[in-house]
Structures are given as structure tokens and as C-alpha cells.
Amino acid sequence: PPHSSNGHSPQDASTSPIKKKKKPGLLNSNNKEQSELRHGPFYYMKQPLTTDPVDVVPQDGRNDFYCWVCHREGQVLCCELCPRVYHAKCLKLTAEPEGDWFCPECEKITVAECIETQSKAMTMLTTEQLSYLLKFALQKMKQPGTEPFQKPVSLDQHPDYAEYIFHPMDLCTLEKNVKKKMYGCTEAFLADAKWILHNCIIYNGGNHKLTQTAKVIIKICEHEVCVPQTKYFLFVIPKLL
């Protein structure tokens, strides 16, 4: 039967994975702030550094419950800038870091957006050109068979989705964010796109057919946005100048 939403298949007791009921806390709008850098939605202002150990459990409904690397629960490190969480062992850390901790995704985004550290390729891009590049990538990501991921999951059809998924994502939402110019670099766009795969694995399991489709979407995204020097800057961007 056709899939009616992104991230999971129609409810079927024979194929639905067994999931523990643990509902992530709702994001408190009073705690939500937009980062000074255009990381995309659901990122927070950097707080003053402390010497206290970093959070090891999601707090205040600001963080996911599932590790960004292995997509499983457990004791996790919470990023100060985004909702992502990680197992220390998945990051191959020998000890828990002290003070405010920023995840690998946010570190890559910060480096890419900082004037002092961004690549020469990114310095050549205007906001409009970046938007054009990301729109082009999105069109490539909308391959035949990706229809389940092209719109938000219907909570009417899948009412338990919010019990597992902290930050829903789909291609339509990505497109809206691009139009609003919420991404300051290709790394930020890719990091947001990865929520599609992360969510799909959490809800459906790693071996589900939809998860394989989600992996293809992310591979296409990585290819389209990670080789700008050889593609966009040689052929696409010069035409926009």
C-alpha cells in the first residue's frame, strides 16, 4: 500500500518495530532563542561558560532522547546549541567534557559560518546564491520514491509519532527554511536534513524500507552540498554573477 507520510509506514502490527514509550519533553518557547549564526530552527543562544559537568540527560524539553550517532537511548551528552544528544562512547570520548558542550554538527556549522574560519568557497557565496544552491540540492533530493518524506508526518494517521520524534523534518519543511534563509552555510542545511534519517530510524528501525530511502536522500544531499568547489562554483555560481 502507498505510504501516506514521511518517516514511517502505515500502521501494521506485523512490521511495526517495538518501541519503548518515552515521550520527549515539548520545546518550551520561552527557552527557545535563535542562534546568532543562522544554524536553522531550534537552536539556542550560547550561554556563559560554566565549570559544571555537561548535562547527561535531556533537560527542560530542549533535547532529543536518542543519540545522534546510534539513534538509541541511554545516558547522553546534551548540546548547548541544538537539540542533539550523543553517547560519550559514540563520540569515542574517554571522559565527559566539562562546561558547556557543543556537538560535532554545531562545531562544523560554526566553523563554516565564522568569517575567520569559513572556506574560500563559502566566502564567495551571497545569501541569494546560497539559497539557490540549496534549492537546487532539494530538487535532486526529491527523487522518485521519496514521496513519504516530502511532507510532514500526519499526526492524525500516526498519533504516537510525537512520542518518539523530538524534531520532525521533511523535504517541504527544509524548502520552507531555505526560502526563509534560515541556513547560513551548506553544513547547516545538511545537519537539518539528517533529522529525516535520524527520525526514520527511531520510528521504523534501521532495516525498514523507508529508512533505506532516507539514507539515499541524505547521500544525495551530502553529494550536492559537499562538492561546491567542483560543481557549483565552476558551473552554477558564475552564471549568477
Which residues make up each language-model segment?
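C-terminal recognition-helix end and immediately following basic linker
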Residues: 93-95
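Chromatin reader modules
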Residues: 1-81, 88, 98-241
